[in-house]
Design a protein with these regions (language model features):
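N-terminal Rossmann-fold cofactor-binding loop
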Residues: 30-35, 49-50
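Conserved Rossmann-fold NAD(P)-dependent oxidoreductase catalytic core, especially the SDR/UDP-sugar
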Residues: 96-139
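N-terminal Rossmann NAD(P)H-binding glycine-rich loop of SDR-like oxidoreductase domains
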Residues: 3-23
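Residues at the starts of beta-strands that form the adenosine-phosphate
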Residues: 2, 26-27, 108-109
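SDR active-site strand-loop-helix element
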Residues: 6, 30, 66-72, 110-115
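NAD(P)H-binding glycine-rich loop region in Rossmannoid oxidoreductase-like domains
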Residues: 39, 43, 47-93, 101-104, ...
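Short, glycine/serine-rich, charged loops/turns that create anion-binding
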Residues: 34, 74, 117
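Active-site helix of classical SDR
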Residues: 142
Length: 144
């Protein structure tokens, strides 16, 4: 199976790359810039700045599955409107753009990892699959 991975340099992404390579999947990583830390087995596609809604078409050729981990977790400008806009651009618009491009390229599966934060900030018991999302802050809203 040929997999395109975004967010491959992040915390989860690095671990996932190692495991997928170990299991002999064919991995491509859509990255902002080349990264020398990837194993040689990982093909890198430089798509540039994710805030500019990049064209992923070259990286989607012959891909069976997209695993989308990339996202914005921190914004420096703390004005609430700016923060939400910054998160929305990457966590919502980029995700939708990539999903549309993947569908147009004939990709069979699109896996998107979100965040537990979409369920709210506090709970005294574990969240359940049928719980209604209750995002409380701009990051969580953008991941919902």
């Amino acid at each position: 199976m040929k997999i395109l991975l975004t967010g491959a340099t992040g915390y989860i992404g690095r671990a996932l790359v190692a495991e997928l390579v170990r299991q002999n999947f064919i991995i491509s990583a859509a990255v902002r810039q080349k990264n020398s830390l990837f194993p040689n087995e990982v093909k890198q596609f430089v798509v540039g700045d994710f805030e500019r809604n990049p064209d992923f078409s070259a990286s989607l050729v012959e891909i069976d599955c997209v695993i989308h981990l990339a996202g914005k977790a921190h914004v420096i400008d703390k004005a609430k409107v700016s923060v939400l806009k910054g998160f929305h651009k990457i966590n919502t618009e980029l995700t939708l753009n990539l999903a549309k491009q993947a569908a147009m390229a004939g990709v069979n599966r699109f896996i998107f990892l979100s965040s537990i934060r979409v369920n709210g900030n506090k709970s005294t018991k574990p969240f359940l699959e049928d719980d209604v999302p209750n995002p409380q802050e701009p990051y969580a809203i953008s991941k919902h």
